[in-house]
């Protein structure tokens, strides 16, 4: 496989060839109408990973709720690799307030959780409005008080233990 890389002429692009936006230009760029809501996430590394993913996919913003760690923090920055400077985020003392804020902006709100009414991710109908996706605590998941406020729930169907 590595031989093909050289024989086929495949190579990684240089930073200059990637033509990446500056942090300022990135903040002003058009975003996907998606809000990620983190409901009492414990791990700073998980929070940093969400920032980095949101940066990669041009996600509109992240809402950090409850005891979810917030930037600036060394362990978040270690995983986020600069994304805390480019991705818009807000802190809400409780997730219910974050859900209300997303709905006020016209977003539908979906829990990423296994419930008796979950829709498999691949069966989710196309969005007609922005979507807010709630990810719950690593152990407890999305809390019942938050589930009751959601427009639905989606789950990834698979055999992997996550």
Model-derived regions, located:
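Post-transcriptional modification and biogenesis factors for structured RNAs
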Residues: 1-159
């Amino acid at each position: 496989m590595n031989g093909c890389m050289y024989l086929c002429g495949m190579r990684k692009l240089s930073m200059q060839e990637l033509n990446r936006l500056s942090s300022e230009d990135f903040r002003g760029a058009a975003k996907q109408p998606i809000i990620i809501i983190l409901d009492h996430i414990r791990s700073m590394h998980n929070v940093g990973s969400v920032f980095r993913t949101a940066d990669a996919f041009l996600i509109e913003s992240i809402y950090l709720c409850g005891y979810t760690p917030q930037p600036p923090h060394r362990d978040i920055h270690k995983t986020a690799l600069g994304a805390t400077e480019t991705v818009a985020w807000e802190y809400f003392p409780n997730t219910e307030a974050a859900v209300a804020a997303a709905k006020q902006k016209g977003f539908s709100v979906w829990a990423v959780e296994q419930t008796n009414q979950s829709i498999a991710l691949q069966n989710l109908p196309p969005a007609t409005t922005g979507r807010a996706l709630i990810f719950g605590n690593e152990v407890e998941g999305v809390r019942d008080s938050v589930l009751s406020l959601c427009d639905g729930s989606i789950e990834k169907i698979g055999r992997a233990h996550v």
